[in-house]
Amino acid sequence: LHLMPLLQMPHPHNDGGYAVEDFDTVDPALGTNKDLENLTRELRKAGISLCLDFVMNHTASTHRWAMAAKAGDPWFQAYYHLYEDRTIPDQYEQTVPQVFPNTAPGNFTWCEEMHKWVLTTFHDYQWDLNYANPAVFVDMTKSILHLANLGVEVFRIDAVPYIWKQLGTTCRNLPQVHTIVRMLRMVLECVCPAVILKGEVVMAPKELAAYFGTPEKPECHMLYNVSTMVNLWGALASRDTRLLKAQLDALHALPDNCWFVNYLRCHDDIGWGLDEAVEEKLGIDPQKHKEYLYHFYEGNFPGSWAKGELYNYDPATGDARSCGTTASLCGVEQALEKNDTIALDYAVKRDLLLHTAMAFL
């Protein structure tokens, strides 16, 4: 059972709970730590493991570490990436992509209390942690062990590819990220070996499998099967299974320690991260294909049955993502609105087709 973020968060701006104010405490609006402990106990009796998100990349700007940093404490200022002028931030901006170019442009936020620039990859109220400071890893590990002691058995480690920063790079998928995940895995294997790490790695297919580590040096126990999810939706819209087949062939060639979570939709958007090298080999223009897919699934293409929403469109790059439930993207919503029973039958068949494909992978 994977519950959405429930740790203490600021209100109202909290990115759906992914801006964490206290990693050790359940948000008072949702309950108490005792409630969480009671829940995990009852779930375990029923043979159910509880999964919670553990946000590794950042804290809320109202976290006690951030508040101490704002108050001038140098110890906690070292927990974040802080700069007195734009010299280094401007160097980062030359190579680091923006996650939310429309709603949260740039990768840095000015903090008036400190008179410093803060690295904020996601939103201005989410301060990126500095894992080059060993104290950050130690304290974050203490928090994940605390939650394990409350009975949480699976941790979805959020935004893990972003956690290491280095000038002159994209600050994505750097080698140090794998070292940190490996260290966390080693701690868990020593202290609570039944606990599982589920990596949220929404990256290009070639980057994905590396987060399993190797049989000798394992990292995540399991990963979301992002590539198959994206390729299934792509095949449905394009009526072309070649990309899907190539991706499945690559998947089956991975070592036995690779354990994927197959899924069609989740709370996140669909990022159209297809394998561009394979697309080009098949004579498919990667950019035009991506544009076709996100326009198709927003319903803005002749013959589209979908009624999703375009998300995070960046006119500079032509990049965008898609939002919508499985039913809406398969055509159920549009068919019901038009009272079209034939279209509804096709929509349900699409839904069943995708679930059948995912179930037997």
Residue ranges of predicted features:
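Active-site and adjacent substrate-binding regions of carbohydrate-active enzymes
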Residues: L1-L361
